[in-house]
């Protein structure tokens, strides 16, 4: 099956949030199932210094009255084919924000749709978040391309209808107040990035005023848990760490802790309880909750706190002042550094995610993989990935709290600090987290079922043989009988520059360009 991802990010080249991790890691797992997965994304100027890109574009066209070119490259890690939409509007260093953000991503979505119609025609066009939300609308009456829309964060919903009408053409049948709402209505299938988040967004508390619409389309909505790349995130082989370690031998983690303390200017103490946080510094992530409890925690315990991230200026200022008040006990780096983030995962004893809401969260998976015990709020994907620790029966992998209140968070932190005093049981807790399997392989089977469903194909049974095949890293047989109709379809070829073959244009007697 031919699957085209359309997204604004792809790790490791361009990553701002969890969407970049998903887009960079899910395709290889889908390829193991026999799918041909490719990506189209904006051609950000910084990519030209990170990737080997075709000298000449493979296609030129225009849309929204503007010319663009498409270049081809390969993912540096997994070899996935990537198509870059080249235009000066993507030259600035910023990825998000700016006065032209709405036009920028609507233009990208339109270019991606034109590419799918004219150059490489997929069976499924998989769109990610509001940046690609108009694609399901334009594809709605094309019977040859099915659309899947993934909600990574419902809070960000894109431009409103009145603005869309000014910057592009909206089909007469289009409904929905903004890009996100339109995508939810017109995508053939919709998924959220965790089962719990898929349920939460149908309530008024987490629905961001779209709960009514999400209940209306609930028949095509499902939750599929995110995963992580276990090869890229492996404490036994991670070259960014001063010492490697595993669940069977944690001695290297102690070395990482000392190096982290030295590098961050903290007191070098093996017995200190080090809390790590790698996050966008925004209200969603509960940074304000940390600021409310940190002074008391540092005053009454031997805790140390390390924070890495950028975001809201007010929260950055609050963290900077906290570090100034507790020199040697609290360190804040207001930037993003991949190597330093890995050192924090490896060198911290516990990891903080006191989120207001959390669609899935990937940081807690990295933390557990590196032996850092998560302290999380019971919300969204954190519910699905961090079962609460129970000393009575030695179960669970982290410390959880319910309400978004300082006293609840503080209580969870004290519980974690007290548990750290009992080193033998703490190491068992670390090992349980490190042994969890949150690879993309199992999630890929769920996506495979969804793709087959939307294309009207028979769903394969994820039996023991398939799971075993995945665990050995083998690719599935792409010539399964039920796939014959789709696999027999001719490969698309590079199309010449020229008029769009958008079927809606033929239907309405107009051109998208």
From Swiss-Prot:
PANTHER family: ALPHA AMYLASE DOMAIN-CONTAINING PROTEIN, GRANULE-BOUND STARCH SYNTHASE 1, CHLOROPLASTIC/AMYLOPLASTIC. Residues 470-513 are annotated as: Disordered. GO terms for molecular function: alpha-1,4-glucan glucosyltransferase (ADP-glucose donor) activity; alpha-1,4-glucan glucosyltransferase (UDP-glucose donor) activity. CDD domains: GT5_Glycogen_synthase_DULL1-like (cd03791). ADP-alpha-D-glucose binds at residue 15. It catalyses: [(1->4)-alpha-D-glucosyl](n) + ADP-alpha-D-glucose = [(1->4)-alpha-D-glucosyl](n+1) + ADP + H(+). It comes from the Bacteria. Pfam families: Glyco_transf_5 (PF08323), Glycos_transf_1 (PF00534). Its EC number is 2.4.1.21. It is an enzyme of class 2 (transferase). NCBIfam families: glgA (TIGR02095), PRK00654.1-3 (NF001900). SUPFAM superfamilies: UDP-Glycosyltransferase/glycogen phosphorylase. Synthesizes alpha-1,4-glucan chains using ADP-glucose. Pathway: Glycan biosynthesis; glycogen biosynthesis. Keywords: Glycogen biosynthesis, Glycosyltransferase, Transferase. Belongs to the glycosyltransferase 1 family. Bacterial/plant glycogen synthase subfamily. This is Glycogen synthase. GO terms for biological process: glycogen biosynthetic process. The keyword Transferase applies. It comes from Parasynechococcus marenigrum (strain WH8102).
